Each structure stands twice: as C-alpha cells, then as structure tokens.
UniProtKB/Swiss-Prot annotation:
Homodimer. This is Reticulon-3. The keyword Transmembrane applies. May be involved in membrane trafficking in the early secretory pathway. It is found in: Endoplasmic reticulum membrane; Golgi apparatus membrane. The chain crosses the membrane at residues 45-65, 154-174. Residues 25-213 form the Reticulon domain. Pfam families: Reticulon. One of its GO terms (cellular component) is Golgi apparatus. The keyword Endoplasmic reticulum applies. It comes from Xenopus tropicalis. Disulfide bonds: none annotated. GO terms for biological process: negative regulation of amyloid-beta formation; vesicle-mediated transport. Residues 1-20 are annotated as: Disordered. The gene is rtn3.
Length: 213
C-alpha cells in the first residue's frame, strides 16, 4: 500500500509554520514582549530614517563598518586581555564560527513554495482587476490609484514606509484598547460603502451588472 502520509504531514507542518510566524509577528505588533518589540521598532525606524537621509549604498556601508568596528574592537580587546593575563582562551568568536548557519534545502524549498503560492494568487487577482472581471472592483482600484497620485505628490516611498511602520506598531494597541468603538464606526462605514456599491451596480447595463454580481 502506498504511503500517503508524506504530503499531508508536509502540508500540516507548513501550515503550522505559517501560523507560528504569524503569531510571532502579531506578538511583535501588540508589544507582548516590550523589549523585543522595542528593539525591532527602533531598529526599523533607524534604518528607514537613515535611508531617508542617505543613499542605500551609504547606509549599507555604514552598517557594515559599524559591525566591523564592534567585532574587530572586541577581538583586539580579548587578544590584549589574554596576553596580559597570560591565558589561552582561543578565538573569542570560536563558538559562533563553529556554529552551522547553512540554510537547509528543505527550509529553502518550503519558503519558496509558500512565496510562490502567494505570488500566483496575487497575479491571478491582478489579472482579474485589469481585465475587469468585476467592474466595481476595477473602479475601486482606479479610484485608489487616483488618490495615490496625490499621496505620491506629497510623500515619497521612504516617508510612506516610515508612516506604515508607525501605524503597524501603534494601531494594534489602539484597536485593542478601543475595539468596541472602532468596530462600531467601521461597521457604519462598511454599510455606507456597501450601499453605494449596490446603487452603482443597479445603474450598470445588464451584462455588466450580471458580471459584477
């Protein structure tokens, strides 16, 4: 009898991995561990602010130089300390140098297959929008892009990323605190948008109306 447990167990482990990574991101954004979230938030903001002030080549160069300054200084310090104390503790980074940090083929294939599934889903949705499978959805995209032309005239990409990070690390906390009130207003907006959409669909020609429904 053929063993069919392989693909199924692989799918289950992949789903579990996605749920685990999703929970980790959620914990970061909800500040479950203040120290860890603070480090990620601070590091991301420093990187984005650096990219806003300098070119990406300069930022990468400064990051590499900073890291080398720390590791070289520590390496020289430990060597001098061993010479003064006449000890032979060996290379200070020996445990890290001996650690296996190679990326396994299974992990790479799993990440690739997961990414490919998301890319294919996004491509299919983009094709539907541009080929007007649903007229209302395509009109929503056109309206969004029209609004983005005004946003792009005021903000550049890095500024939008900075605002996005600020929102990502503050909005979940605000939502968690005022969940009932926010859900109430979101429901009102959703009902209003749905009402407008239904009015637009009612005025569409017969063929387009059927397609959008």
């Amino acid at each position: 009898m053929a063993d069919t447990s392989g693909p199924q167990s692989s799918h289950i482990s992949s789903s579990a991995g996605e749920k685990g990574s999703g929970c980790a991101v959620q914990d970061l954004l909800y500040w479950r561990d203040v120290k860890q979230s603070g480090m990620v938030f601070g590091g991301t903001m420093v990187l984005l602010l650096s990219l806003a002030a300098f070119s990406i080549i300069s930022v990468i160069s400064y990051l590499v130089l900073s890291l080398l300054a720390v590791t070289i200084s520590y390496r020289v310090y430990k060597s001098v300390l061993q010479a003064v104390q006449k000890t032979d503790e060996g290379h200070p980074f020996k445990p890290l140098l001996e650690k296996d940090i190679a990326l396994s083929s299974d992990a790479f294939q799993k990440a690739l297959s997961t990414s490919l599934a998301h890319v294919n889903h996004a491509l299919k949705y983009i094709v539907r929008l541009f080929l007007v499978e649903d007229l209302v959805d395509s009109l929503k995209l056109a309206l969004l892009m029209w609004l983005m032309t005004y946003v792009g005239a005021v903000f550049n990409g890095i500024t939008l990323l900075i605002l996005g990070v600020l929102l990502a690390f503050t909005a979940p906390i605000v939502y968690e605190k005022y969940k009932v009130q926010i859900d109430h207003y979101v429901s009102l907006v959703h009902s209003h948008v749905k009402s407008i959409t239904e009015k637009i669909q009612a005025k569409l020609p017969g063929a387009l109306k059927k397609k959008s429904e």
